[in-house]
């Protein structure tokens, strides 16, 4: 821990956000503050946000969702596909997608959320990504304009495109934890699988409001979304540190 503290002091990262060297050392060792409640964790991860005035996504919307998805009463972070009366998975308009109640504040800098696939159903047609307000929630994230998504059945990334997407990462399914990160500074998006960074999926994102979004599209598919109510599997705090350090290093090289 002492060595990490010295390294962080030398990096001189994120003093503007009032993180102490000990705080940052804890993050680097992935001691993800499991004792914190959701509000405390979100405040810790996004210290530049005035949490008394601005909401960071902390819940799934009760209304901004497809009719083909339902949240569970016992656990409001769990979502399940509601079986369509039509032949499943051969139609493009009976996807069950859901957004968070609030958009991602720009002050977050780098925002992150995860989902755990509890059941990948008949087809494994689960997705995670970002959408803007008003986009079609009967479609998967990534199929329409101002939507982006990483899909579990083929591992492809979809960028505002209803086609086949592009090869991005591994497929994922039952018991996998998949995360989505939005870098509001570089206007880029990345994903993780089981705590491992998969790389940047898209750059030069438009300046709009982004909502964390997940989609399900076959019988019995069920996921649990993590919006900071518990520790993330991926160490997003370290990602923020490394990004800030890289930015400062680049600034020194160009000055």
Predicted regions and their residues:
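PRY/SPRY (B30.2) beta-sandwich protein-interaction domains
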Residues: 1-255
């Amino acid at each position: 821990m002492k060595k990490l503290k010295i390294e962080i002091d030398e990096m001189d990262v994120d003093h503007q956000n009032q993180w102490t060297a000990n705080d940052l050392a804890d993050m680097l060792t992935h001691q993800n503050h499991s004792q914190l409640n959701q509000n405390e964790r979100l405040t810790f991860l996004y210290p530049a946000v005035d949490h008394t005035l601005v909401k960071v996504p902390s819940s799934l919307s009760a209304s901004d969702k497809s009719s083909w998805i339902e949240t569970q009463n016992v656990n409001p972070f769990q979502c399940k596909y509601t079986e369509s009366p039509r032949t499943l998975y051969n139609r493009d308009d009976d996807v069950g997608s859901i957004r968070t109640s609030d958009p991602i504040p720009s002050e977050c800098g780098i925002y992150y959320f995860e989902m755990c696939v509890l059941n990948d159903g008949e087809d494994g047609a689960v997705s995670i990504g970002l959408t803007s307000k008003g986009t079609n929630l009967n479609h998967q994230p990534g199929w329409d304009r101002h939507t982006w998504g990483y899909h579990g059945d083929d591992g492809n990334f979809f960028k505002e495109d209803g086609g086949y997407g592009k090869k991005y990462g591994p497929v994922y399914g039952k018991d996998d934890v998949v995360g989505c990160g939005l870098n509001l500074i570089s206007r880029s998006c990345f994903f993780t699988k089981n705590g491992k960074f998969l790389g940047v999926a898209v750059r030069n994102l438009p300046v709009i409001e982004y909502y964390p979004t997940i989609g399900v599209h076959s019988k019995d598919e069920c996921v649990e979304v993590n919006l900071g109510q518990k520790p993330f599997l991926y160490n997003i705090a370290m990602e923020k540190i490394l990004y800030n350090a890289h930015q400062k290093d680049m600034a020194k090289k160009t000055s």
